[in-house]
A protein has these predicted regions:
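NAD(P)+-binding Rossmann beta1-loop-alpha1 motif at the extreme N-terminus of oxidoreductases
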Residues: 2-73
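Short, well-ordered alpha-helices that flank and scaffold nucleotide-derived cofactor binding pockets
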Residues: 26, 30-34, 55, 95, ...
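Rossmann-like NAD(P)(H) cofactor-binding subdomain of soluble oxidoreductases
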Residues: 47, 60-148
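Short, charged/polar "capping" segments at the starts of alpha-helices
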Residues: 48-52, 120-123, 163-165, 291
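Internal alpha-helical scaffold of NAD(P)-dependent oxidoreductase catalytic cores
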Residues: 51-56, 60, 127-133, 148-238
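Interdomain hinge/lid region at the active-site interface
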Residues: 234-291
Length: 298
């Protein structure tokens, strides 16, 4: 008699091996398993890390192979290989998989997709030369943990025809939205993502530092600035940047800019950021040559 507690999975046709059980790799494993993909293998830096990720799939289902990275040669065959390692390890993983492929005969070659935002499918060339379909899928979402919800996320996809089809299917099944870009544009695309996410965090940290110089503690400064940031994001949801811009540069307030520049003289990093972003803000507004000249002279 079957175990009544064991979760019954619908039949699936796609087996998946995930190499790199970090935050994104584990989040993908959990999300794909929830959509009835069969997680064949999980590879992490250590077997213990892989087992930890596997337990998040289904505590009652221990069928997934767990491997330490050093034992990649024992990896079982699968239809799809997702390489979710750091960027500087992807080429090595591709070479190892290609070497492993030499010892196996397949009627149908698998697909390999990596999840780097900056690298194209070209980094998987060793696999392409073995007849694999190769590509990349990258989620435009901050993955803060293994249970990060991927539903509704935008994903960039590039690669060969089969890889594009597989990538689009995965994104659709995960409740996301996909768009394709040229392989050579991956670095520019990823830089745009960094500008709108990571660099915003860095800029927010500079603003915190400035308020702390005013005598506020960091926690209070954060509480004060977060609603302002949230209101700006809300404006950008419905308006073009030129219409969403408010404040000193939108008004062309010359005297206030003078006061800001004077106050920032002792903070070189903040001063340089203020100058560069101020000039960009002026491009979104009516021309204010006096302010531009002031910023250029700093």
């Amino acid at each position: 008699m079957p175990d009544a507690k064991r979760k019954q999975k619908p039949p699936v046709s796609v087996t998946v091996s995930i190499i790199g059980a970090g935050r994104l790799g584990t989040a993908l494993a959990v999300a794909l398993a929830d959509k009835s993909y069969s997680i064949q293998s999980l590879v992490a830096r250590t077997a213990a890390s892989a087992r930890k990720a596997a337990k998040l799939l289904d505590p009652l289902d221990d069928t997934a192979q767990v491997l330490a990275a050093k034992n990649l040669g024992s990896l079982q065959p699968a239809d799809l290989f997702l390489i979710t390692t750091p960027d500087d390890q992807i080429a090595h993983v591709a070479s190892e998989l290609a070497r492993l492929e030499n010892t196996r005969a397949r009627a149908q070659k698998p697909t390999a997709l990596h999840t780097s935002g900056a690298l194209s499918a070209e980094v998987l060339a060793p696999l392409r030369k073995r007849g694999w379909s190769t590509g990349s899928i990258h989620p435009l979402i901050s993955v803060s943990g293994s249970t990060t919800a991927l539903d509704g996320a935008f994903w960039s996809i590039e690669g060969d025809k089969t890889a594009l089809r597989v990538g689009k299917t995965i994104v659709r099944d995960l409740g996301g939205k996909s768009f394709s870009i040229r392989s050579e544009d991956k670095p520019l695309y990823h830089a745009a993502a960094v500008m709108s996410a990571g660099n915003v965090v860095a800029l927010f940290d500079v603003a915190l530092e400035m308020l702390m110089q005013c005598g506020l503690d960091r926690k209070t400064a954060r509480s004060i600035l977060l609603p302002l940031l949230a209101s700006t994001v809300h404006n950008l949801e419905t308006k073009d940047p030129a219409a969403a811009l408010t404040g000193t540069f939108a008004r062309g307030d010359i005297e206030t800019v003078k006061r800001h520049l004077k106050a920032l003289k002792t903070n070189k990093d903040a001063l340089e950021l203020y100058r560069l972003l101020g000039k960009r803000s002026l491009k979104l507004t009516k021309d204010h040559p006096q302010i531009t000249q002031m910023l250029d002279s700093v």
